[in-house]
Amino acid sequence: MHVKTSNEISIMLEGGKILAEVLSNLLSKVRPGVSELELDTLAEKLIKEKGAEPGFKRVKGYKHTICVSTNDVVVHGVPTEYRLKVGDIIGIDCGVYYKGFNTDMAETVKISNIKYQTSKRDDEIDKFLKTGKRALEEGIKVARLGNRVGHISKKIQDIVEGAGYSVVRSLVGHGVGKSLHEEPEVPGYLNERIEQTPLLVEGLTIAVEVIYNMGKKDVIYANNDGWSIKSKDSSLSGLFERTIAITKDGPLVLTQV
């Protein structure tokens, strides 16, 4: 595990603020008719204007600034010309590289149109997305000094599965810092005793992720782009993520929207 100094955490907080502002801007542009690639282009423009670099473009072989999870895409969706329509959901996952450090965050939203009446499906999607947001918030709350990764994992799993959804097992949160992916892994589920999971120590920076499906937990690689992962049963998938630091005063969200 790569423990950060207070100065390094301050740098990550600066980068995280840039990332949160960019993602907030992107989410404000999400509406029917907007294409995934348009959002990707805007993301790169905004990040560079703020003096940072697109973190995901530093990943070997990946050529975009964001990953998009539209409908049944779970993670790592490559932006395309697909134009969003009412009833879709889209997760935007974005990373920023700033002064030598990465931050990472994601949010999933529904494409709505106030001219249309809400339906039972709308209500189901709203419940699904609210569950993911709550699981992330509650998972972060237990990311305290002296607790373990397993406390985060159990909290996320209990909330997601308690609502009738499934946590994806093959994709997890992670440490983040000078590298986009560092130790430890931070699963959204518990597959061992909490006492056997890594201890949360002061200065640890992690990306807490809630990766879950409305249907079953199984996923498959999709298309031929080598990146996009979808739910195997084509059910909707949600993604919520924040980068946080473990401090003596509690969890510090570095990518606060």
Stretch-by-stretch model annotation:
Residues 1-257:
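Active-site neighborhoods and metal-handling regions in enzymes and metal-associated proteins
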